[in-house]
Amino acid sequence: MEFAGGSLRLGAERGEERFIFDNEKWGHDVELAPFAISAFPVTNAQFRDYADDGGAPPRYWKKMDGEWRERRFDRWQPLEPDAPVRHIDWNEGQAWCRWAGRRLPSEAEWTCAAGAMHWGEVWEWTASTFAPFPGFSADPYADYSQPWFGTHKVLKGASFATPCRLMNNAFRNFYMAERGDVFAGFRTCRMDP
């Protein structure tokens, strides 16, 4: 999906009738260059091709009788080829992107495209480091966001396990780059020409 770029309002707006975390405050304008983003997250089949070409498989995959299987709770099940790959850490997403000649989207690019793309099956890694928005002020529980600025990566979207009240494209999830236990996957952008 191609986007022309331009100005984007990133973050929550005052007066929204939902719970807003301190790291979503407040909406501010960012400028985006034109970009192209995948309509869907990277699938098991796409990641399987990478693993078959020598890339590291996800931690919950194992080859059995010549076929990749995925651990789901206490069972090894055949991969669903069209399902988004999950339990991928940020570094694994970056490695796949290098292999495929793609890149992770920025938080702003993902947010810009959110209204036009399918999301909500897995949290999606972005290229963006978790940082405060301009004018950030910690909520009374200061340890929710502030200690993690600069050391975590932003994930956008939601997973099947996300409560409905948190499912909106302004929500900013964040984890350390090596966390692969999260229901996380990724989508990609075309490399800039």
Kindly give the residue locations of the regions a language model identified.
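Surface-exposed recognition segments
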Residues: 22-28, 52-60, 117-193
